[in-house]
């Protein structure tokens, strides 16, 4: 990992933490196949570094998980509805679209998401 790539990831993490009033943890001990997660009860995003080969993958995973944070800010009761398959599928579809956008144009996707997080999560506690 180059210093520049690492700096880009750290910058994006900081932007998501500030705009989304959340915490981002970079983990090295996730189970195989888990790229990242959003834990609404802990208001934190986990990025599984051990399951990514580069920072580019971590960045788009961060966008995906930050979209789940945004979804939670838009509808705080979502955490209670996560047992409904249709709700989970809709949430994952929206997050996957954000991830795909990030793969195509990381800067534009990150800027849009940062603005949305500021607007929708601004009054949320950390």
Show where each model-derived region lies:
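Glycine-rich short-loop/terminal segments
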Residues: 1-40
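Solvent-exposed loop/turn segments at secondary-structure junctions
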Residues: 51-53, 68, 76
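Long, well-structured alpha-helical subdomains associated
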Residues: 101-126
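Short active-site segment of divalent metal-dependent hydrolases/proteases
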Residues: 63-71
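Post-HEXXH active-site segment of zinc metalloproteases
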Residues: 56-60, 72-105
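Sequence contexts marking disulfide-bonded cysteines in secreted/extracellular proteins
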Residues: 29-31, 47-49, 96, 120-124
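Short pre-active-site segment immediately N-terminal to the catalytic Zn-binding motif
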Residues: 45-62
